[in-house]
Regions:
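A short, structured loop/turn motif at beta-sheet edges
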Residues: 1-4, 40-43
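Residues at beta-strand starts and edge strands
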Residues: 2-4, 32-34, 60
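A short beta-strand micro-motif
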Residues: 3-12
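A short, structured beta-strand/loop element
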Residues: 18-28
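A short, exposed loop/beta-hairpin motif centered on an aromatic-Gly-Thr core
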Residues: 26-41
Length: 75
C-alpha cells in the first residue's frame, strides 16, 4: 500500500468566508487547503477514501492527490 497526501478544501465555506459569513456546519479553516494523509492501493482508492469522509455533495473539493514521500535525514 502507498501513502498519499490529499489536498482538500470546502468550496461552500470558501465562498461564505469571502462574503464575510460563516458556514453553519464547517469552521472557516475549511476555506483553506487541508492536507490529509491516507494509505491506499492506488490514487483512485485514495481519492475514494477521502470522498467518503468529505463528500463532494457537501462542498468538499479534492485539489490534489500525490504520493507522500518521507524525508530522510542525511547521515
Amino acid at each position: 500500500m502507498t501513502k498519499y497526501e490529499v489536498t482538500v478544501y470546502n468550496a461552500q465555506v470558501r465562498k461564505m468566508v469571502e462574503a464575510g459569513e460563516h458556514h453553519p456546519q464547517w469552521d472557516d479553516e475549511w476555506a483553506e487547503f487541508r492536507y490529509i494523509d491516507v494509505t491506499a492501493d492506488n490514487e483512485d482508492k485514495a481519492r475514494a477514501q477521502i470522498e467518503s469522509r468529505y463528500p463532494p455533495g457537501q462542498g468538499f473539493i479534492i485539489d490534489n492527490v500525490a504520493e507522500h514521500y518521507e524525508h530522510q535525514e542525511d547521515e
